[in-house]
Amino acid sequence: MLAAPVMFIEGLVAYLILPVQNLTQPEDIVDFFNSNASLIGLVGLFGTVLSISFLGGLYVSYDLKDKGENIDPLNALSIGFKKFFPFLGAYFICSIAIFFSAFLLILPAFYVAGRLALFPPLMMLENKGVMDSLRLSWDKTDEHGGILFGLTLAFFLITFLVASLLQLILEPGIGQIAVLAVLEYVVVIPWGYVYFSLYKSLKNQ
């Protein structure tokens, strides 16, 4: 339920830009975006806010589940939203680090992604700042870099291969968009829990 609003908005964005697939001329593509830029931009901005709030709220939900407690999905999103700007900042810096590491080779990008993957629980559950959460994530995962690299690469490959297969099987349209949106979060939620479990394990040492 926590992911439902995010899946809906992301699906809506994909649906709004779906007609681009049928356009072959550059000027037609430019005209399409000129005509729909405001709507796509507004929905996309709302989707970004929801996505960041979801990621923050997800780790709060993990923590409460681990303690045998429950939280209303809207409350979890609300808690995530309160950390929107620092979470967005950390996510942006993390993305830049992964992007530049990909210039070396593709594989180092997965290593960096795995090493920085503990910043969400550090930020949401320990109230760490942007740079502190990234630094602590890197420091705490020093002995687990190889495992995190393997897990991050495996989750990415599973998602990529299944998504590619579904795109081949399903006709482009709202059905394909809906299935791919569900697939994304079927992978993201257990993927995030793996990182949360490592965070809890390191914290209890």
Task: Label the model's feature ranges.
Residues M1-Q205:
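Hydrophobic alpha-helical membrane segments
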